[in-house]
Amino acid sequence: MAEKIKLEIVTPEKKVLSEMVDIVVAPGQEGEFGVLPHHIPFLSKLKVGELRYRIGQTLRCVAIMGGYAEVLPDQVTILAPAAEEAGEIDVIRAKAARERAERRLAETKDRLEFTRAQAALQRAVARLKVAEKT
């Protein structure tokens, strides 16, 4: 049996996921990073995006809304403000959120509102990207 690494994804509301996986690929602030069993320990800030993991031949995805990753030789813990597995994502709601954010980006002149609209767009796009992979 091949070695596995434990992946845990935790939000303030709940433990989203706890699985033994073959590999984790996370959206780090400085770019994606992959983790296999026996990886050197490190901490990383995460950006909004798609976290992928593989169990056997099955690739699965989770939309994460930023946060932090703690990597240990036998475990990856993701602490995120929000995270959704592909099956939990409401595609209609995510598309509506994307359209609202795009409209706000086109209409706003306020710098703070523009930044908020950009963040909303990133979240909606991440959800849609993960939902497409189901």
Curated annotation (Swiss-Prot):
Disulfide bonds: none annotated. It is found in: Cell inner membrane. Pfam families: ATP-synt_DE (PF00401), ATP-synt_DE_N (PF02823). It comes from the Bacteria. GO terms for cellular component: plasma membrane; proton-transporting ATP synthase complex. Keywords: ATP synthesis, Cell inner membrane, Cell membrane, CF(1), Hydrogen ion transport, Ion transport, Membrane, Transport. It is a peripheral membrane protein. One of its GO terms (molecular function) is ATP binding. Belongs to the ATPase epsilon chain family. Produces ATP from ADP in the presence of a proton gradient across the membrane. F-type ATPases have 2 components, CF(1) - the catalytic core - and CF(0) - the membrane proton channel. CF(1) has five subunits: alpha(3), beta(3), gamma(1), delta(1), epsilon(1). CF(0) has three main subunits: a, b and c. This is ATP synthase epsilon chain.
